[in-house]
Amino acid sequence: MKRTLFLLLALGLCACGRYGGVPAAYHPLLDAALADCPRADSLRALLHETPRAEREGMAYLLVWMPRGDRDTMRLDLLRENVAYAYRARAEYPWTQALPDSIFLNEVLPYAAVDEVRDSWRPDFYARFGRRVAGCRDLREALDAVNRSIVAEVEVEYNTAREKTNQSPAESMRQHMASCTGLSVLLVDALRAAGIPARFAGTPAWHDDRGNHSWVEVWIDGEWHFTEYYCPPALDAAWFLPDAGRAPEGDPAHAVYAVSFRPTGGYFPMVWSERSREVHGVDVSRRYRDLYASQVEERLAAGTHVEVGFRMFRDRRHAVQSADRVAANVDVFCGDEQMGGGRTAGPRQDMNDVLRFLLEKGKTYTFRYENARGELTEVTAEVGGEPVTVTGYME
């Protein structure tokens, strides 16, 4: 009897000494991840030192983190990240209500893409914890963070930023960032407040007009999109008409969302085109369906009308197809951008006109750079009937 008890105790100690407190499903994954890691012993010790209630989260990161992070990332950053993620889960009812799979993959991760690994969680936990205090649910918390982030971190969009994929600390030091850096800030701010968020974007719009990055949030079992400069509502940012034309399965033009856990695909990063270390999933179909539904609803309601825009060389050459010029055009209503696109060039069909679906009874400004590189504006009042607006490069 004593021998049996001794054997059982010994087996229990071995199990605890290996990955105690970690669900068994992680054990072979941890073995594989740590097999050729130069600091495997340190990571095992870190896992063992992690509070038992947080150990699955630490295991999740160790298993799925990029190899470079596993080999070099500061252990105190890992420890801190896990601690504050679970602290948010204990504090916020909307985080407590999340499925484990969403918490682990969309709240817990320490990075949005491949940015420098910063110690952002303690600072953002304090900053945005104040903003969500008193919020009753996830939607209220999301709105509180999204509307306050610009004032809270004091970072604005600026092409003079040092690099594309800036970390929160890098962007806050410069007070400027690209749309990528701004999206990293928002993802991290939302995660700090226990709100599931992930980085999303496209390498290039369907018309090769440029790339863009934004943020997706998980609410009531579905993904919705927003961005750093808070749009009027979820799934209502200016870029939906472009994202809604993204060709599914096209690595150069599809819309992708980042996943910390492998998906079988990767997130294409225009600032690091050869990298495959950031996992991703093609979400183009959702944007196409959403845009088609929006167009159908607006046309049925009679609140919007189609507005075309053509670009010609100058007023003397504005008749033939050969006179047309391909140019990037953005449309605004006041300070709010409503959309953008690229006009048809001389070799495209004359019926190929850049089109926008705009609300009736408002004045819109179309902005583009002329042949001299100067910002040019064309203003048009949109009534109840379709209209075509013309711009000139010279």
Residue ranges: model-predicted function:
Residues 13-15:
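C-terminal motif of bacterial Sec signal peptides marking the signal peptidase cleavage site
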Residues 1-4:
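Positively charged n-region of N-terminal signal peptides that target proteins for export
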